[in-house]
Every structure is written in structure tokens, then in C-alpha cells.
């Protein structure tokens, strides 16, 4: 027996009952970004593999273990994007968007792909909304991005469910000095490290700070801290960021072990986390990447950005029960028509109502059927009113107008009076 067709593990369908919450989140954030002066950019899903190897970094879990990579028919190595920043930087460089110090404030949304173990809140195809800013080096733009996300949580009704964790990774020189000290400390305790952390000792030792293994975290209690190796400029940048967050009353926690999972970050690093989703508690993360553009062959260009996971945010909205009820509102009107003349009249009336009453949710019966079957479908649809058209109604240019959710009587309404009558009924609800 052939295997039934189904979605690939970790790549999920987003069903009709789920999409209203997705659209609500995306629409809310798009409106917020527009108000802050950010422009949308749309990026390809496929990029040359080299882009991510150079940008994210060899030795990272993303590059070494998680990328979907293949050779195309020309022998080119292509990768389905595991994140959005590298592709956005590539687009900015390719199209000269940051030339001459021009400030770019961009956002994008779409699917990303990583070969990870699927679990609640973590999938192999997942969706992100990302924001990237170029040619602004100061802490003021870092603060703006964090405040922007804070405002989104407020709009969505989840501000009390998330916590901001903040850190500075310093300059590349400061990180190099700290890396040397951390490696020396951990080398003496190498055999006590978990296997993954032992591997990271030679590839990306700073990522050991982010280990979820309790025994490794216990070893790190006495480890040197990055803040002891910071340069004065990075300290000033971090103090400037904190001062701006303090000025607007945005609370945060300093987490010196927050290093983010990608190699390109420097100075500011931040995450918004929640304790409502179990192990997958990070719903948004980002930071500064001043060296990434030059790493791709461009001129040194300050950059900062963040990405948020749409699946996790939707899950958090559901967990907190803050999805507006009107997102799943039923139809306002269901049109029943009996006979071809009535079906034609119903179609014309429906379009007239859609033009007259913006935002109306109107269903026209499809597939004919008896009066009983059409009325049954009208009731099942959840519509508030039914519109009834038969031969007599068409001949007299009237409709039967029947409430379905209260005890009101059916009325006969002239076609010309219908838009005004229906609008008045909808306004009363």
C-alpha cells in the first residue's frame, strides 16, 4: 500500500482557523513599522550557500548542522535561508542601498528553514518578521528597535508576559581577549564539559555560555565575564542604550551569558523571553552587527536588527487568550436564492451590498439546493441574517430579510432600501 501524502515533518500547514491570528499579528506589526518609518523589502528564499557560511559563521550549529543545502543543475550550492539578516545585507550591498552613508530602515517577513528536531514552538519551516537598520552607529537606534518591539507587545496585550534580557558583546577585539580567557578557564575543566560544549571549544567557545546543560552552567559560575574585558567605547554605547530604555520606563534584565547563536553580533544583544511556552521561551532576538557588511565585501557599515518568531508569538497569543474575538467573526449575511432568475438577482444584489457596506462579510449560496438545505447552510455558517430570493421576490423587486441569531420576524425589504436597512441592522449589533 502506498504511503499517504502528508506534509514533511516539521513543516506545517497553517489552517483556515489559524490564519486570522497570523494576519492580525502581521497586520499589527506592519502598521507599527510604517508609523516608525520602516520600509518593507521582499527577499528570495534561496541564496548561494557561501552567503550563510561567510555571514553566520563556520562552526555554528546553523551552518554545520541545520541548513537545507543542495546543488542545482549547474552545480551551484544553494541553501534555503535559515535566517533573514544575511540575505537582507546581500540585497543592500547588491543594490547600493547603503551607499554614501544613506540610512536604510527595512523590514521583511517570510518562511525560514532549519533542520532541527521538531517540537512545540520549534519547526523546520518557521516564519519570522525581521527588521534591519544600516548606517546608524549609535545606541539611539538600538533603543528604538527595542522600544518598537515593546510597543508591539503592548498592542498585542502580551507586555506582562515577556521580559527583556540585555547584554553587550563589546568590540571584536574585546571578544577576542575574552575568548582567550574563557578558553583558558574551560580548558582546565574540559573533561567536565558536555560533548557539545567540548566541540564548541574549537569552533565557537562563546556559545558555551548559552549551554542548556546544567552541569556546564555550574562550571561557568566561576568563569571570567565578558564585561570585564569590554573596551570603553562599548561600555559607553551600552550605558547610552540603558539610559534611553530607562527614560521611557522600559524594564530589562542584564544577562551576561546572552551571546546569541550567530557569529556576526557585536555590542548590543537582546532577547525577549517568556515563561509561558516552556523550553522555547525566546520570542524575539537581535543585536548589532557592525562588521557584517564589510565581511561581505562592502565598506564598513553599522548595522543592527532583530527577528521574531511568528509561530511562537501566535502560540503566546493563544496561551494568553488575547486574540480579538472579532477576528473569527462569522458572516453578516447569507443569501439564499431559488431558481435561476433569483440566483442572478442574488449575485447582483450581493455585489451592490459589498460596494455599499465596506467590510461586510457576505456569503452567497453556491450549488443551488432546496429551501430547507440552503437555510440549513445559512444557519450553520453562523451568519446573523439571511436574505431570501425566489421567483415572487424577483418579480416584486423585494427580498426576504430574516434574523438568524434572535427572535425577530422575517421582513420584506425593497431592493433599493436594502443597503440602508442592512447597514442599520449591523450598526446596532
Curated annotation (Swiss-Prot):
Compartment(s) of residence: Cytoplasm
Pfam families membership: HGTP_anticodon, tRNA-synt_His
The keyword Aminoacyl-tRNA synthetase is annotated on this UniProt entry: yes
Domain of life from the UniProt record: Bacteria
GO biological process terms on file: histidyl-tRNA aminoacylation
Enzyme class (EC, first level): ligase
Known catalytic reactions: tRNA(His) + L-histidine + ATP = L-histidyl-tRNA(His) + AMP + diphosphate + H(+)
E.C. numbers: 6.1.1.21
GO molecular function, one term: histidine-tRNA ligase activity
Keywords: Aminoacyl-tRNA synthetase, ATP-binding, Cytoplasm, Ligase, Nucleotide-binding, Protein biosynthesis
Classification via InterPro entries: aa-tRNA-synth_II, aa-tRNA-synth_II/BPL/LPL, Anticodon-bd, Anticodon-bd_dom_sf, His-tRNA-ligase, HisRS-like_core, HisRS/HisZ, HisRS_anticodon
CDD domains: HisRS-like_core (cd00773), HisRS_anticodon (cd00859)
Family, per entry: Belongs to the class-II aminoacyl-tRNA synthetase family.
SUBUNIT field: Homodimer.
Protein name: Histidine--tRNA ligase
UniProt organism field: Pseudomonas paraeruginosa (strain DSM 24068 / PA7)
Organism phylogeny: Bacteria, Pseudomonadati, Pseudomonadota, Gammaproteobacteria, Pseudomonadales
Amino acid at each position: 500500500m502506498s504511503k499517504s501524502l502528508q506534509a514533511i515533518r516539521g513543516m506545517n500547514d497553517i489552517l483556515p482557523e489559524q490564519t486570522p491570528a497570523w494576519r492580525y499579528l502581521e497586520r499589527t506589526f506592519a502598521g507599527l513599522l510604517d508609523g516608525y518609518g520602516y520600509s518593507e523589502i521582499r527577499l528570495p528564499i534561496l541564496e548561494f550557500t557561501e552567503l550563510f557560511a561567510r555571514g553566520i559563521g563556520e562552526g555554528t550549529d546553523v551552518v554545520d548542522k541545520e541548513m537545507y543545502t543542495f546543488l542545482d543543475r549547474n552545480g551551484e550550492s544553494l541553501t534555503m535561508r535559515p535566517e533573514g539578516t544575511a540575505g537582507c545585507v546581500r540585497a543592500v550591498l547588491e543594490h547600493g542601498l547603503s551607499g554614501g552613508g544613506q540610512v536604510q530602515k527595512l523590514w521583511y517577513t517570510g518562511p525560514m528553514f532549519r533542520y532541527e528536531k521538531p517540537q512545540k514552538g520549534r519547526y523546520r519551516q518557521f516564519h519570522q518578521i525581521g527588521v534591519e537598520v544600516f548606517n546608524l552607529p549609535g545606541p539611539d537606534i538600538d533603543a528604538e528597535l527595542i522600544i518598537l518591539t515593546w510597543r508591539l507587545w503592548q498592542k498585542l496585550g502580551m507586555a506582562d508576559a515577556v521580559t527583556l534580557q540585555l547584554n553587550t558583546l563589546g568590540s571584536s577585539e574585546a571578544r577576542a581577549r575574552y575568548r582567550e580567557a574563557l578558553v583558558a578557564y574551560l580548558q582546565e575543566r574540559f573533561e567536565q564539559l558536555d560533548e557539545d560544549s567540548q566541540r564548541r571549544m574549537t569552533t565557537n567557545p562563546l556559545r558555551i555560555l548559552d549551554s542548556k546543560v546544567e552541569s556546564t552552567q555550574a562550571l561557568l559560575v566561576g568563569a571570567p565575564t565578558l564585561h570585564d574585558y569590554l573596551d570603553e567605547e562599548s561600555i559607553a554605547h551600552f550605558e547610552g542604550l540603558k539610559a534611553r530604555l530607562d527614560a521611557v520606563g522600559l524594564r530589562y534584565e542584564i544577562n551576561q551569558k546572552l551571546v546569541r547563536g550567530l557569529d556576526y553580533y557585536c555590542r548590543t544583544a537582546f532577547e525577549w523571553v517568556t515563561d509561558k511556552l516552556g523550553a522555547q521561551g525566546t520570542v524575539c532576538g537581535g543585536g548589532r552587527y557592525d562588521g557584517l557588511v564589510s565581511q561581505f565585501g562592502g565598506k564598513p557599515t553599522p548595522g543592527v536588527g532583530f527577528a521574531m518568531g511568528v509561530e511562537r508569538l501566535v502560540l503566546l497569543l493563544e496561551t494568553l487568550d488575547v486574540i480579538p474575538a472579532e477576528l473569527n467573526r462569522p458572516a453578516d449575511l447569507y443569501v439564499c436564492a431559488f431558481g435561476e432568475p433569483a440566483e442572478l438577482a442574488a449575485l447582483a444584489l450581493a455585489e451592490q451590498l459589498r460596494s455599499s457596506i465596506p467590510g461586510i462579510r457576505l456569503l452567497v449560496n453556491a450549488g443551488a439546493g432546496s429551501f430547507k438545505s440552503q437555510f440549513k447552510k445559512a444557519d450553520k455558517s453562523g451568519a446573523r441574517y439571511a436574505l431570501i430570493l425566489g421567483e415572487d421576490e424577483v418579480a416584486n423587486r423585494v427580498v426576504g430579510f430574516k434574523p438568524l441569531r434572535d427572535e425577530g420576524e422575517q421582513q420584506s425589504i425593497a431592493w433599493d432600501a436594502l443597503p440602508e436597512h442592512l447597514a442599520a441592522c449591523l450598526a446596532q449589533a
